[in-house]
From Swiss-Prot:
Pfam families, per the entry: Peptidase_S51
Main location: cytoplasm
Cellular component GO terms, alphabetical: cytoplasm
Record Gene3D superfamilies: 3.40.50.880
Protein name, UniProt field: Peptidase E
Function: Hydrolyzes dipeptides containing N-terminal aspartate residues. May play a role in allowing the cell to use peptide aspartate to spare carbon otherwise required for the synthesis of the aspartate family of amino acids.
Compartments reported by the entry: Cytoplasm
Protein family according to the UniProt entry: Belongs to the peptidase S51 family.
Active site per the UniProt annotation: S118 (charge relay system), D133 (charge relay system), H155 (charge relay system)
Length: 243
């Protein structure tokens, strides 16, 4: 498969996709017809226009899958697909409702380049269980696209040792996930991304990532790390830690 999985689409102080623009335009075929999936936000037209503006100078023809009335037809005519960020629960619900969930799996496994950002990157994992988002809607299932066999946590945020906030840190939430599921989780800090080409996966971007596994301490991963071994994991959900 051919995947570009961004932690975020907007970096502080920079424009939409600006921090990853060279990587994005290098990933997409020249002059590509890009099917954009805007369902993670409520205003699909404005969202699509924003993506179109960001990629116009690169000669990318951005087409919202909601435009024209048939999302599946938009996907069929595309040279690549971009699933944008927003609320992951809203996005997954729409993928099920439109039939795009099954169509995306088939198309991407058949060679269609897939780019995700934030919620779109969450969709590439097997399950929605490591999203940061509020469940504003209830999808039919937490099962996402399963393009990679491990979980991803976009926008991964390190604990602040000076914070007086008493809610759970991101690390604590991911440890709770691992108490119930034996599936590795890749924490992608903002500014980082994962590039998958066939059987090879490499960490890219400006910041290191963090890998969580059951029974071991979190491991820091430097930009440029080869993470291909993660493509071979066989995780198990709902295993718990009880004997």
């Amino acid at each position: 498969m051919n995947l570009l999985l961004l932690s975020n689409s907007t970096q502080h102080g920079r424009g939409y996709l600006e921090h990853a623009l060279d990587t994005v335009t290098g990933f997409l075929p020249a002059g590509a017809r890009l099917a954009f999936v805007p369902y993670a936000l409520a205003d699909h037209d404005t969202y699509t226009a924003r993506v179109r503006g960001a990629l116009a100078d690169a000669g990318i023809d951005v087409r919202g899958v909601h435009e024209g009335g048939d999302p599946l037809a938009r996907l069929d005519e595309a040279d690549a697909v971009f699933v944008g960020g927003g609320n992951s629960f809203r996005l997954l619900s729409a993928l099920y409702r439109t039939g795009l969930r099954e169509a995306l799996v088939k198309a991407v496994r058949g060679g269609l380049p897939y780019m995700g950002a934030s919620a779109g990157t969450n969709m590439a994992a097997p399950s929605l269980r490591t999203t940061n988002d509020m469940p504003i809607v209830e999808p039919p299932s937490f099962e996402t696209l399963g393009l990679v066999p491990f979980q991803i946590n976009p926008h991964y945020l390190d604990p602040d040792p000076g914070s007086t906030h008493k809610g759970e840190t991101r690390e604590e939430r991911l440890r709770e996930f691992l108490e119930e599921n034996d599936v590795p989780v890749l924490g992608l800090r903002e500014g980082s991304w994962l590039r998958v080409e066939g059987d090879r996966a490499v960490l890219g971007g400006e910041r290191d990532a963090r890998l969580f596994r059951r029974g071991t301490a979190p491991r820091e991963l430097a930009v440029g790390s080869d993470l291909s071994e993660l493509l071979d994991v066989r995780g198990e959900f709902d295993t718990g830690t009880r004997s």
